[in-house]
Amino acid sequence: MSAIVTELLSTGLVEETRAGISSGGRRPIILEFQDQASFIVGIELGATHVSCVLTDLRCKVRASWSAPAPVRDDPDVALEKMTMAVRSVLDADGVDLSRVLGIGVAVPSPVDDERPGELLPLVAPKWEGYNIATHLRDDFGRPVFLDNDANLGALAELWWGAGCSSGDLAFIKVATGIGAGFTINRRIFRGSRGIAGEIGHTSIDPNGPLCVCGLHGCLTTFIGTPALLERAEAQLRDSGSNRPPPQNIDDLVNAALEGDPSSVEMIRYAGKKLGIGIANMLNLLNPRTVVLGGG
C-alpha cells in the first residue's frame, strides 16, 4: 500500500493534506485526490459541427468551444476546426499542453480496430485516407483515443447516468443519422470491425427510400435530420402554409411547441418510426435500460 501511495504522490494525483485522528498509535495522514493534477480534452465530431471541452480529472468541464463545420463534406476544414478547438479550450483555462493526459474524440462513424483513427468510408466517403488520431497526435503530441459517438454515449450513461445500476444498456443517438451503443455486462459490444449498433441502417420498410448504404427503407432515411426536414418542407408546400420550412431540428421542434399542426404531426411520425426501430432492437438484445440522446 505504501508503495502505491508513494507513486500517486510522485505523480501529483494525491496530496497529503492534514493529520487525521488516531484510533491508537501514530496519527494517520489524510490524502486527497487532486482533480486538477492533469486535464483531459474531449472532442465531438458531428456531421455538421465540431465541439470541444476541457475537463479536470473529475470530468468537470472547465472550458468549452463549438462551431458549425462541414464535417462530412470537407475533412480538411473539419481537421482545422478540431485543432482550433483544442487550442481554444486550453487557452481559455490557461492550461499548458504538458498537463493534458490525452484527447478523446467521438465520431459519427463506426471505428475499426484495424484502422484506428479513421472513419468508415461507407459512412463518410470523403474521409478516405484521413486519420484523425494521427492528425491530432502530430499537432499536439498527446495520446488520442477515438470511438463511435453512440458507444461513448453508452459509456457515459453506464458510468454517470441512467445506466449506473445496469450492466446491459442501449444508448440510441438521434441526430443527422441514427446510431446506437450497446453495453453487455458493463462492456461495449462492438461486433466485427466495430460496426455493431448501426440501428440507423436497419430496414423498417423494404420498399422505402434508397439509403447510402445500399439498402431500402433504413431508419435513417425516415427520421435522420435531412429526411425529416425534407418531409416537413414537402408537407408545408402541399398544405399551402405560409410558414417558412424548418432549417434545422430546433425549428421543427419549436414550431411543434407553438402548436403548428404539420410540425406536431412530423414529431409524431418520427416517434412512431423510431419506436419501430427500438422495438426491433429490444426484441433482439433485451437491454435492461434504453437511453435516448441526440447531438
PLM regions and their residue ranges:
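General beta-strand structural signal in soluble alpha/beta enzymes
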Residues: 14-17, 144-148, 182
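Glycine-rich phosphate-binding loop and adjoining helix at the ATP-binding site
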Residues: 61-168
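Glycine-rich phosphate-binding loop of actin/hexokinase-like ATP-binding domains
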Residues: 160-223
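Short secondary-structure boundary segments
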Residues: 107, 148, 174, 225, ...
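ATP-binding/phosphotransfer module of carbohydrate and carboxylate kinases, centering on a glycine-rich
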Residues: 2-99, 140, 166, 206-207, ...
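Short glycine-rich anion-binding loops that position phosphate/pyrophosphate groups of nucleotides
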Residues: 20, 108-111, 176-177
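Short, glycine/acidic-enriched loop or turn micro-motifs at the edges of active sites
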Residues: 47, 152, 176
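Flexible loop/hinge segments that line or gate small-molecule binding clefts
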Residues: 130, 176, 253, 257
